[in-house]
Amino acid sequence: MNGWVARGLARRAAALGLGLRVLLCFGLCLEIAPTPIQTWSPTQAPGPSAGSCPPTNFQCRSDGRCLPLIWRCDVDQDCPDGSDEEECGTEVPNGSPSPCDIMDDCPDHNKNLLNCGPQSCPEGELCCPLDGVCIPSTWLCDGHRDCSDYSDELGCGTKTHEEGRTMSTGTPVTLENVTYLSNATVTAIEDWDSVQSGNRNVYGIIAAVAVLSISLAAGILFALSRLCAQGCLAPLGLLVSMKGSLQPEKKTSVL
């Protein structure tokens, strides 16, 4: 009887151990099994039909998407087929770049962007060449900067006041040559920089000569002091001894 009970308990223990092993293995397998990564791939919505973009937009040829017109010919491909960068930088028949084509044909200046866009200054007003701001013609050569590039004050010269009227004695500035005043501003700044550079060179030469003169004078004074210390004291001692030798004779003659 006892043996039968012992065998039953052993079977139950073995079955329980097997069940625990199965559960443990199942849990480990769940932890080790890689979780599939779900990736999301955006789907391109079908673009609008041809000719459906507003006049202020550009339509890509491949998918028909609408882009801002300023994105065209900006040296950055925005359409998948690159149609927004085609036929850019066209040239006029004489071979020079076309102005106002949004292409930077002058990397160091904004010459090809001058006078671009609508120039609708009313009569009696002038247009600043750099930013296109309209100013009254009476503000020209009034001693106050009204254009951001100082073009309204270039070529004015000195002014004299006679009978309440302001007169310019310099070169007259007209509407035709105001366009080129920004270039004169750059040239004047470069000339002023060269003048300042020349002045700095002159100041450096003067300072070097001054230092050299001071050093030479100090050397001469030092040499004279050494010579006096060695040779100038001997005559002084000789005079003292001669004075001592003459004093007894003087006293004897008096007696």
UniProtKB/Swiss-Prot annotation:
One of its GO terms (molecular function) is growth factor activity. Glycans are attached at N177, N183. Residues 30-203 are extracellular. Ca(2+) 2 binds at W139, D142, H144, D146, D152, E153. Ca(2+) 1 binds at W71, D74, D76, D78, D84, E85. InterPro entries: LDL_receptor-like_sf (IPR036055), LDLR (IPR050685), LDLR_class-A_CS (IPR023415), LDrepeatLR_classA_rpt (IPR002172). It is a single-pass type I membrane protein. It is found in: Cell membrane. Disulfide bonds join C53-C66, C60-C79, C73-C88, C121-C134, C128-C147, C141-C156. The chain crosses the membrane at residues 204-224. Pfam families: Ldl_recept_a (PF00057). GO terms for biological process: B cell costimulation; cobalamin transport; positive regulation of B cell proliferation; vesicle-mediated transport. Residues 52-89, 120-157 form the LDL-receptor class A domain. GO terms for cellular component: plasma membrane. Residues 1-29 form the signal peptide. Keywords: Cell membrane, Disulfide bond, Glycoprotein, Growth factor, Membrane, Metal-binding, Repeat, Signal, Transmembrane, Transmembrane helix. Residues 225-255 are cytoplasmic. Its main location: membrane. Interacts (via LDL-receptor class A domains) with TCN2. Receptor for transcobalamin saturated with cobalamin (TCbl). Plays an important role in cobalamin uptake. Plasma membrane protein that is expressed on follicular dendritic cells (FDC) and mediates interaction with germinal center B cells. Functions as a costimulator to promote B cell responses to antigenic stimuli; promotes B cell differentiation and proliferation. Germinal center-B (GC-B) cells differentiate into memory B-cells and plasma cells (PC) through interaction with T-cells and follicular dendritic cells (FDC). CD320 augments the proliferation of PC precursors generated by IL-10. This is CD320 antigen.
